[in-house]
Amino acid sequence: VLARLPDECIDCVVTSPPYYMKRQYLGGGIGLEATYQEYIDNLLAIIKEVHRVLKTLGSFWLNIGDSYKNKQLLNIPHRVAIRMQDEQNWILRNTVVWDKMKGAMSQSKDSLGCEYEPMFHFVKKKTGYYYNSDAVRKKPRSARVANGAVVSATGVSGVRYRRKIELSTELTEEQRISAYKALDDVLERIKKGELSDFRMVIKGANQRVTNGNTSNLSGRAKELQDKGFYFLFYNPNGSMISDVWQIVPEDTQGRKLHFAPFPEDLVKTPIILTCPPGGIV
C-alpha cells in the first residue's frame, strides 16, 4: 500500500509493527525472520517508504517491543532507532516510555518482568514540524493574593527569595538592588495574570544551576555570573506532559480479529500533538 502512495502526502504516522518472534500471523509475514538482523532490515525497508510518504513537517511515531533470544535481550527498538537516524536521516525528538501498569506474569527465574515499551517520535525536519503542545499541557493552578502578598501557582510568594538575596555573600550591592527590583517586577506580572509561576536562582544561595555551573556549557550559569541571578518562568498554559505515559493495554480476552490491539490512548496523544486539523493519519 505504501508503495502506491505519492510522496509527502501524510501528516502523521502512528504504528506498531509485529514484534520479533512473538506471534505467528496467517500467511507468515514480518517478525518471523531467521535472525533479528534480517527482521530489522525488513522493518527499515518499510520505514524508508514511510519517510517518503510523510510530509516534510510531519511526524512518525513508532512503538516497538523487544525480544529475547538465547537468553539475551536483543535491544531491537534502539537498534532500529539508531539505524533510522544514521541511514535514513530521521530526527529523533523523544523516546516515550509506555508504562503499561501491568504485564503478563513473568515465568523467568533470572530476569525481571517487563511492563514497558518504548515509543519513538521521529520527524524529518529539526524545526517547524507541526506540534500542538498546548493541547496536551497539564492545566496550571492559578496565582493568588494571600495576606497581602502575591503567591504563585505553586506557593512562591517572594519572601523566601528576598531572604536569599539578603543573605547572599556573593552578590555585589548593585546586583542585590537589581535582584530585589527584578523580583518585584516578576511578582507584579504574577498579580496581573501575565505569569502563573516562576523560580529564581541567586548567586551564593546554594541552589542548583540549570544545565550545570560552567558558563561555557550553560547560558544560565553565565547569566548568574554576570547578573547575580536569573529566573525560570513556567508556561502560563501549564506544564508539558512527561515522556512516561501510564496507559493500561487493551484486554485481549475474547478477541478474534487481532490479539495485539493498540490502546486508544496510546494513539490519541500523538495525533493530538502532531497532526494538524484536517490532516491525514
Feature names for model-found ranges:
Residues 1-281:
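Core catalytic lobe of class I
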